[in-house]
Design a protein with these regions (language model features):
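Local sequence-structure signature of Cys/Sec-based thiol-disulfide redox active-site neighborhoods
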Residues: 9-27, 88-92
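Short, flexible, glycine/charge-rich loop motifs used to bind or transfer phosphoryl groups or to couple energy/partner
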Residues: 15, 85, 229
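Membrane helical hairpin/interfacial module
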Residues: 78-92
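Extracellular Ig-like/FN3 beta-sandwich strand-entry sites
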Residues: 606-608
Length: 669
């Protein structure tokens, strides 16, 4: 972070200063910036303050860490070294268009201004630093600094949404290369859908958009030459959906043979009971769902645990009335800030506690500072704050679980485990390798395990009663010399009934490559004929997708109508649905799943006294990590190997899994 400072160039802002690093914002939008007033804080532990400011909550989130995420960069290395070596420039530019968005976009803006072309931003550009000044990357150091800043302030607060604003700013210098990206990644899509994969347009370089009306403008204008402007679109879910709908080329033999949806978090929400039914362009078919809630309503909380709206000033500046007198100060009408209701934390977390642990335990490896730059020792550092938000979300806002119908009959112990999805999209959602799974255990009176499905070893590998990995858990031989029967696409199916300890209910998405033929058929409904893959640009067919549907998930015909209203095709509606779940009535109706466990009493070494069911989550399952380590030998891969090998996962992520919810022991009658 020492190098990561990019400020507005001299004179009025131009497209050459479209993007700046977050340190240009933290002076005012982090708590404690004045040293006298402590707005945007709450009491923490040990007399320390929790920094609730936009910068304070963002900097330790996965969004703030996106430009340094070692998991992402290892995935990118596999894509460019093994999966799609000949397409590496396109792959790097595409992926860094979200994870390193500031650097990628500013580099394209500047290249277009210089020579009229959109030069692709590379992985090497992310590492560019200014010192020593004769190092080869020094001329590109400001792009590296911007990219490492992650999904930062000017990523979102310049975004324009809706046909009116897009028409106003289309064709301007800051959007020339974005429009080219839209044509490359989203051909044939229109309206909001053409902004998928982070392909949104932005406003001018001298405006920043926020939710509050009538903001005091002069402080920001004097500091960075920008006017803060009210724009209600920052409250819309489309602000998130443009990046959290990932539409990518399908590559086969170095050619694009189609496009597929790698990630459908936004459509999943738009098809659920949580949909608001409106966009910046107006209402959508079928209106709001019964539990309407925007993305920001969950991931950017503006209320405390009791439901009371946060009230705070939205910046920490040297006001006229509340500070000692000073010469040349602006009048109170210009710099005295009102207390606002609805102040939103930029928490922006899911459940990737593993990433936060890597950042906290190895800050020197990721090049970050742990200490709060403004509150210093007075404040709780941002990464623990983000981790606590994740743990709270896991425990209280993700899923429910119950065990019913416990009894013995026909020589077997039987129990019904029901899992309820409490989030506004599939669970898990986001990148397709995330997974959740059930552990169901039979216990004796001394709490010893007599039988268990879904138990793991210390590395998070799901194992059977003998400790051997169950089918599909590992993709490679231990020495990475070969895949394990890759054409068989071995995996755990979606179960309605489980009877053995080498069976486990895993909620996941699995996809396959195009088959090795000249003209493969890919897309919704295509038969899986290739190999299981973790490549984002090889998604030809789905093998399995039984991730828990959100409440109120609409039928296909309704999903297609909404998809078309958003400017997408029927394929988005189809790809957002489940795959290979059969006619399981407990699943297909949405919002829940139920599994019957039927255990032969002859397999129990003692008398069953209780049963227990627990839902676990893995952001980086063992097969995914193994595929990283076996498909690249890059510096980024070695870095992830080092971090994963030395990571202390004790506590919330013991045995490389995060407990979401548990039934606790339930007595066997």
């Amino acid at each position: 972070q020492t190098y990561d400072n990019v400020w507005v160039k001299a004179n009025e802002p131009t497209a050459a200063s479209q993007y700046v690093t977050s340190d240009q914002c933290l002076g005012c939008h982090s708590a404690g910036g004045t040293g006298l007033q402590y707005d945007m804080t709450a009491p923490g532990t040990d007399t320390k303050l929790i920094n609730l400011s936009p910068y304070g909550t963002w900097r330790g989130s996965p969004m703030g860490l996106a430009g340094r995420d070692p998991i992402f960069f290892a995935q990118l290395a596999s894509e460019t070294q093994t999966f799609h070596r000949d397409a590496a420039p396109m792959v790097e530019n595409t992926c860094l268009g979200c994870h390193g968005i500031l650097g990628q976009r500013q580099a394209e803006i500047d290249s277009y201004a210089k020579n009229g072309t959109c030069e692709k931003f590379s992985r090497a550009g992310v590492d560019a630093v200014p010192y020593p000044p004769d190092n080869p990357s020094a001329p590109l150091a400001h792009y590296g600094a911007l990219a490492r800043d992650g999904i930062s302030c000017t990523s979102c607060h310049r975004m324009v949404l809706g046909k009116t604003d897009e028409a106003k700013y289309a064709g301007q210098p800051q959007n020339k290369c974005v429009e080219e990206r839209q044509q490359e990644l989203n051909p044939g899509l229109a309206g909001f859908a053409k902004t998928f994969t982070g392909s949104f347009l932005v406003g001018p370089p001298d405006q920043l958009y926020g939710l509050f009306q009538e903001p005091k403008k002069k402080s920001m204008k004097h500091a960075i030459g920008n006017d803060p402007e009210h724009n209600a679109n920052v409250l819309s879910s489309e602000l998130c959906g443009t990046c959290h709908t990932v539409h990518l080329p399908v590559l086969h033999r170095d050619q694009t043979i189609g496009h597929s949806y790698e990630q459908t978090t936004y459509p999943e929400w738009a098809f659920s009971a949580y949909r608001t039914g409106s966009t910046p362009d107006g209402p959508l078919p079928f209106g709001a769902g019964a539990q309407a809630q925007s993305c920001q309503g969950c991931h950017m909380p503006n209320k405390d645990a009791r439901g009371n709206p946060y009230r705070s000033k939205i910046a920490a500046i040297q006001e006229y009335t509340n500070f000692p007198q000073a010469e040349h100060a602006l009048p109170p009408a210009d710099i005295d800030l009102p207390t606002r209701a609805g102040f939103a934390q930029h928490t922006l977390v899911g459940l990737n506690v593993f990433l936060l642990k890597m950042a906290w335990q190895f800050p020197d490896v990721l090049g970050i500072r742990r200490a709060d730059p403004m509150l210093s020792t007075m404040g709780i550092d941002s990464i623990p704050t983000s981790e606590n938000a994740m743990l709270n979300q896991a425990a209280n806002a993700t899923a429910g679980i119950t065990i019913t119908e416990i009894g013995s009959a026909e020589g077997a112990l039987k129990a019904l485990v029901t899992v309820t999805n409490r989030v506004g999209h599939k669970f898990p959602s986001g990148v397709g390798f995330r997974r959740a799974f059930l552990q169901f255990s039979v216990l004796d009176k001394d709490n010893r395990t007599l039988w268990s499905s879904g138990r793991t070893n210390g590395m998070g590998v799901i194992v059977d009663h003998d400790g051997a990995p169950i089918a599909g858990e590992l993709w490679w031989k231990d020495d990475c010399s070969a895949r394990i029967d890759p054409d068989a696409r071995i995996h755990q199916p979606h179960y309605a009934v489980i009877t053995r300890q080498d069976q486990a209910q895993i909620y996941q998405e699995l996809v396959s490559t195009p088959p090795n033929v000249a003209a493969p058929t890919c897309g919704p409904g295509a038969k899986a004929e290739g190999q299981l893959t973790t490549s984002f640009l090889s998604i030809c067919a789905k093998v399995k997708d039984n991730r828990l549907l959100p409440q109120g998930f609409l039928p296909l015909a309704d999903r297609i109508e909404i998809s078309r209203a958003l400017g997408a095709g029927a394929d988005m509606a189809e790809e957002s649905g489940p795959t290979e779940v059969g006619d399981d009535p407990e699943y297909v109706n949405g919002g829940r799943d139920a599994v019957v466990y039927r255990i032969p009493l002859s397999e129990l070494s003692g008398k069953p006294a209780a049963v227990e069911a627990t839902l676990y989550y893995q952001a980086t399952p063992p097969f995914f990590l193994q595929d990283r380590f076996c498909t690249s030998n890059s510096t980024d891969t070695k870095r992830l190997y080092y971090l994963a090998g030395k990571l202390d996962v004790s506590g919330s992520t013991q045995d490389w899994k995060l407990r979401v919810v548990t039934s606790g022991p339930v007595s066997v009658p």
